[in-house]
Swiss-Prot record:
Keywords for this protein: Neurogenesis
Native organism: Danio rerio (Zebrafish)
Low complexity bias (residue ranges): 151-164
Positions in coiled-coil regions: none
UniProt biased composition (Pro residues): 141-150
The keyword ATP-binding is annotated on this UniProt entry: no
Annotated family: Belongs to the UPF0524 family.
Superkingdom per UniProt: Eukaryota
Positions of transmembrane segments: none
Name by which UniProt lists this protein: UPF0524 protein C3orf70 homolog A
Disruption phenotype: Double knockout of c3orf70a and c3orf70b resulted in significantly decreased expression of the mature neuron markers elavl3 and eno2 and the midbrain/hindbrain marker irx3b. Neurobehaviors related to circadian rhythm and altered light-dark conditions were significantly impaired.
Extent of Basic and acidic residues compositional bias: 179-191
Amino acid sequence: MAASGGQKSEKLDEAQALARSCAGRPDFLPCDGLSICATHSHGKCFKLHWCCHLGWCHCKYVYQPMTSVCQLPSTAVPVAPSGHTHTMNLSISLAERFLRTAPKFQAPPCPESPKFCVISDLFVDDYMVKRINGKMCYVQRPPPPTPNPTHQPQTAAPQPVPQRSKNSHQVGPTVKQGQAKEKISAPKMDHCSSPSSSEDSGINALGLHYMESCDEDSCVDDDDEEEEDDELSTDGNSSPGSFWDQDECTLLSPSKSIVEIIEKIETTV
């Protein structure tokens, strides 16, 4: 309690000292109790103002009141523009320009209707299911000759594709070379078709027939596979050369393709 009383007495003494110092100034003005006290001290931009502090009047620096706008020097604004002026009314000028150029405005052209592709044209769907060494494989059929080719790019030169026989797991095999070499051209590629270079499609990256899409591990001679070959080879249209005689067939999907069997062209000793 004694400490708090001592602090109050110190503040009171300070306020009295400020009041005495301010009262002796020649510009002393009594405090009206309504002015806001300020603690700024920015030199000539401020004037002295008397305020109350702990019941005693003392002086403080406050902001100098702003000069009224009416008292500031100003340039006389003419009532009407003179004849020699370089100004213009932008709104009127833009409106007149728009009215002059409005008849020349044209609506944007209507965009062309989108061209749709048939979903079946996006896939090379001329495959045949063939049985090679006991394994069913997809082999692409050579494209039929078109009488009037349209939008056909320049095709590559025809390349002969010899058929190689599987000669694994044999000591002295004698391979039959009865199958003739056939020259085929690359398939037709237009804007709707997409070339396939994967091994699953049965063609290589050049669009030729992929004759080695089957694994060589599946060429093991089993009695069951020989019996199936004998049963399936009873069909009259199962000769090795019958595959090349079907150039006039239409394009078929793998679900509607022709099942053809290639008999083993290897002999065992």
